[in-house]
Amino acid sequence: MRELTKDDVLAAVKGGSVFASGGGGWVDHGLEIGGAALAVGKPKLVSVDELPDDAIILTCTAIGAPAGRDWQMLGKDYIKAVQLIIEKYEGKIVGVMTPQNGMSSTINGWLPAAALGLVVVDATGDIRAHPTGKMGSLGLSSNIEYETIQAVAGGKPEIGSYLELIVKGTVARTSNILRTASDMAGGFIAAARHPLPAKYIKEHAAIGGISIAIDLGRAIIEAEPFGPAHVLETITEKTGGRIIGTGKVRKKDVHYSGAFDIGTIEIESEENTYILHVMNEYMAVEDRGGKRYSTFPDVITTFSIETGQPVSVGNIEEGAEIAVFAIDKAKIPLSSSVKDPSVYPEVEEVLGIELYKYAFEEKKEINV
């Protein structure tokens, strides 16, 4: 167990931005929420092995489309979502975890943990960011015997979009309800969900996910004074990732629908045109001939050639010079969530491409 610091906040945002895979929130939001956590308390990071098997851990997150522009999530909303669970749940909540890393989502839970006297557990529902709550639900999405409890809070009271909601039921049904609530609240909403014992977390989460992001962030911070090329080299070396290709953004065709950013981004190089399939995050990379280069749950990230910084889907602009980067799933801890075949059809239908087949059924990943 150790106390999280201001340096950890910056490192978590920097490293989390790589694992964000084009989504995972916003840098400014992550810094703000992390700073608020340190202002109201002393959040502590603990290994799941430090907790008794029956200690109850809650997942803290935010639900929505990162490119949305009419949402509002304040620090109090993250706290309120956890409080709603605490009020209704019969057991005692001991700690919080995040379902994913990201520009701000690595820091999910730090503020309510600091405010409510909980610990931050060093585990993630997925090492990278993903579009649906089911993909970070620790393999529970297809379990109809598990009754979860989920709560959300957020929106703009001045325009009547503020919502608080608490629901019980299966993971699949309740997750769909909260996605609708997010849309009604302006496109993003703070959430808390899935109280689970530490024993289950140990068996099903991506253990050490927070520390992995923080360690990468520290390496990035050390590399930044030496320029963007050195930053990209450092990230590649630290993660075992690879640059799939570099080029100019030829076309961005991404639209908002049902609290998701959906579409494609085309990166044109001298040798090839890469198509990035987007559902909030980058879910696959292929070329016009259909050759697949990377598929979720690989980490897929776009970097600015000019700055060496990750660029989110919402901030990608046509004409920008971009590097397409990937970390093969074999080089990251995988949770039960991303191995669960039931979480893929919804996303595959929206994108119009296959994911699970490429990720787990066939050896089709191309190392370049």
Residue ranges and their predicted role:
Residues 213-269:
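Oxyanion-binding "anion nests"
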Residues 26-30, 78-79, 99-110, 127-131:
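Short glycine/serine/threonine-rich phosphate/pyrophosphate-binding segments
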Residues 114-134:
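Short, acidic/small-residue loops that bind anionic groups at enzyme active sites
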Residues 51-94:
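Glycine-rich oxoanion-binding loops at beta->alpha junctions
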Residues 251-368:
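C-terminal non-catalytic interaction/assembly regions of soluble proteins
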Residues 150-219:
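Phosphate/diphosphate-binding glycine-rich loops and adjacent basic-rich segments that engage nucleotide
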Residues 51-67, 135-180:
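A structural-propensity feature for long, helix-poor, extended segments
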Residues 10-62, 308, 312-330:
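N-terminal low-complexity or amphipathic/hydrophobic leaders
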